[in-house]
Design a protein with these regions (language model features):
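Start-transfer (signal-anchor) and selected internal transmembrane alpha helices
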Residues: 1-51
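Coil-to-alpha-helix initiation sites in intrinsically disordered, low-complexity, charged segments
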Residues: 16, 26-27, 85, 104-108, ...
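Juxtamembrane/transmembrane-helix boundary motifs in multi-pass membrane proteins
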Residues: 22-26, 30, 116-121, 125, ...
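Transmembrane signal-anchor hairpin modules in multi-pass inner-membrane enzymes, especially those
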Residues: 23-24, 28, 59-67, 202
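Hydrophobic alpha-helical transmembrane segments
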Residues: 32-36, 109, 127, 155-159
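Short hydrophobic/aromatic segments of transmembrane alpha-helices and their interfaces
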Residues: 33, 50, 89, 150-152, ...
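Membrane-interface coil-to-helix junctions
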Residues: 39-136, 164-179
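Membrane-embedded helix bundles of polyisoprenyl
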Residues: 128-130, 134-143, 147, 152-203
Length: 203
C-alpha cells in the first residue's frame, strides 16, 4: 500500500514538473516581447550610447556614477589583495573595499580577472543597467502570471514594475540600488519553494 502511494506521489510530482516546464516554454515568446519593449524604453530614457563599453564620458559626471566608475578604474589597475576586493590606490596607505565605491563588486572582480582581454577604456555600467531593467521586467512577469491568465495584463504589469520611479532615479546615481530585480527573484524563489517543496518527498 505504501509503495503504491509512493509511486502515485512520484507520478504526480513528475506531472507537476512537466506542466511547469510547458507553461514556462509557452511564455518564452512573451518574455522576449517584454525584453524588446524594455530595451526600447531604456534607449529612450538613457540613450543607447551608454551601452557602449568603450564610451566613458557619460560616467564622468558629478553624480555618484563617477565614484562607481573611478572605483572600477582603480580596482582594475591595482594588484590583487586579500580579501578579494581590497584596493589602496585611492586612499593610500589605507585599504578600502570595492564594495564602498558601489562599483558592482561581482562584475568588478569578474572583469578584473579578464583584464588582459579588455580595451584600455572599459565600462560595464550601461550594460548592467539594461540587464537590471530586463530582469526586472521578466521576474515581475513570472510573478504576475500566477495571478492572471491575461498575457496582456502580464506584459503591461511588468512594464509598470520596470518604470517605477525608484528604479529610474537610482539607475545611474546609485546603480547598485537599481538591482531591484533581486527582490523579485527572491519572491519568485519563495513561490517556487512553496509550489514544489513536496516534490521530493517519498510519501
Amino acid at each position: 500500500m505504501a509503495k503504491k502511494k509512493k509511486n502515485k506521489s512520484k507520478k504526480t510530482n513528475k506531472k507537476e514538473k512537466v506542466e511547469y516546464i510547458k507553461e514556462e516554454s509557452s511564455f518564452i515568446g512573451y518574455y522576449i516581447i517584454i525584453a524588446v519593449i524594455i530595451f526600447i524604453i531604456f534607449g529612450l530614457i538613457y540613450g543607447l550610447r551608454v551601452l557602449n563599453p568603450l564610451y566613458e564620458d557619460w560616467a564622468l559626471t558629478k553624480s555618484d556614477l563617477m565614484q562607481h566608475y573611478s572605483g572600477w578604474k582603480a580596482f582594475r589597475n591595482e594588484s590583487w589583495h586579500f580579501p578579494i576586493g581590497l584596493l589602496n590606490s585611492v586612499s593610500y596607505p589605507t585599504y578600502i573595499s570595492i564594495i564602498y565605491t558601489d562599483s558592482i563588486p561581482l562584475l568588478a572582480v569578474f572583469f578584473k580577472l579578464i583584464w588582459f582581454l579588455l580595451p584600455k577604456t572599459f565600462q560595464y555600467f550601461g550594460l548592467y543597467g539594461l540587464t537590471c531593467y530586463i530582469l526586472q521586467g521578466i521576474f515581475s512577469a513570472k510573478i504576475l502570471k500566477k495571478y492572471t491568465d491575461s498575457k496582456i495584463n502580464v506584459i503591461v504589469g511588468s512594464l509598470i514594475f520596470t518604470l517605477i520611479p525608484s528604479m529610474m532615479f537610482r539607475m545611474f546615481y546609485h546603480t547598485a540600488l537599481a538591482s531591484q530585480w533581486l527582490i523579485l527573484l527572491s519572491l519568485e524563489t519563495i513561490y517556487l519553494y512553496n509550489d514544489y517543496k513536496d516534490s521530493n518527498k517519498i510519501y
